[in-house]
Amino acid sequence: MEINGISGVGMSTAFPLEKNTSSTSVADGAGKFFKELVGKVNDLSQQSDQAIQKLATGENRNLHETMIAVEKASVSFLFMSQVRNKALEAYQEVMRMPV
């Protein structure tokens, strides 16, 4: 009786590795993430400012739409600051690790 080893489940085909021509590191990915996050928060802030200006000039008479835009900008900024704080805490924790 021949005993064969357990064959692979095929995980390499289930989760193929991305083949990039340029080598990207985790730091590059994190930098790209934060850059996109700041850009989106900035866009929401600008939309909020535009909504306030339109309400003040009478171009837009819907106060609720303006308040929604302002709250979106506020919540997105708070989210961004919390993500920043968590990333900074993680960095500080890594720096405290003994070598």
Swiss-Prot record:
It comes from the Bacteria. InterPro entries: FliE (IPR001624). Keywords: Bacterial flagellum. The keyword Phosphoprotein does not apply. GO terms for biological process: bacterial-type flagellum-dependent cell motility. The keyword Thylakoid does not apply. GO terms for molecular function: cytoskeletal motor activity; structural molecule activity. GO terms for cellular component: bacterial-type flagellum basal body. It is found in: Bacterial flagellum basal body. Belongs to the FliE family. This is Flagellar hook-basal body complex protein FliE. It comes from Trichlorobacter lovleyi (strain ATCC BAA-1151 / DSM 17278 / SZ). The lineage of its organism: Bacteria, Pseudomonadati, Thermodesulfobacteriota, Desulfuromonadia, Geobacterales.
